[in-house]
Amino acid sequence: FLTSGHGLILGGHSWYWSYSNSDVAHNYPGNKIAPTTGLFVSSNSGSAQVTIGATPPDRMQRTLAAVTALQNHFTTGPLIPSSDASTVEKTISRSTAMLTLDFIDFWNPLRGMVNATGWTEIAENKKYDLDADPIADVMLAIQEGLYLRLPANELVAHPSAVDFPGAVPANASRVTEIVSVNGDYIGLPSGFGYSGARSHGMMGTGLYAAAGEVVNISVPVALVDQNVRIQIGAHSDSLWGKDVLDRHPKIHRNWVIDSTTMHVGNTFGGLIFITFPPDSTFGIVNVTIENAVQAPRYIAGVTTEAEWNMTQRLLPAPWAELEGEFFILTVPSSEIRSLDSVVELMEWWDTAL
């Protein structure tokens, strides 16, 4: 219908749809139609006021034109003028947030640029000013788009991971463990709305993925294609709204479980979680995790104070979890190495809450 020259009006948006669904580019119903026009519906929200001018839009608002301009900027020239830099940044950044790696006309040139320029390093002693340089900002967005999409066997340890979330000790052993997780998760009542009522529940494993390393995880068939995920990294926030960064904006990664055998990883490393959607009733499930690092973990009513003091707090991963009845603390392991009274601490928090 569209390709034969007819018109179509699409009503609706994908930002709310994207809260409980994945892969906007392929799975959002409107994007099964829109690409034939050269357009996509993104999951971003925007202003309801749109001014349609008498002249065509800036050419740099076209994705491939912006990619070509950026590629030329780093190779043959010309340099992108300052008057176009912000437009190029916004155009490409919107696409990196949505387009998957199979959009090769978009991603292949960008991957070549990252290979040539290297990774942007951000650390406590090497801060990054957002909005100071649109070209640097768009390269940061491109790098993020890649490390959140590359298959596990193509990931490398990000140079910034040593600073945050921290390095795994060089002598830390890699282990294989069978871990039991609770697959029953109600979620918050829908009335919580924007407070993440329909967010997944994170179930800890006590294991850590080293930066850039492949972790193999085997799960029961009952979890496959049920919107159950593997999350690597406890920090699921985004810092893109800040003015100054002392770590990268996004350092966690989710893998949707679509097979009984998953190969996962994170360029920054992080604690390993199995996350369940609201209204899950899977019961206790056993997952096998291979090539991970043991992390300090206290579970109220399960871990004894002797086990904590003699074994758990000494485990090598750089982040630890303390689980009370109502509250979980996720903290750098350096903060708990000398914590002797973990039972008293978590009982205090449970009483307070």
Where are the language model's segments positioned?
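Solvent-exposed loop/turn segments at secondary-structure junctions
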Residues: 8, 13-18, 41, 47-51, ...
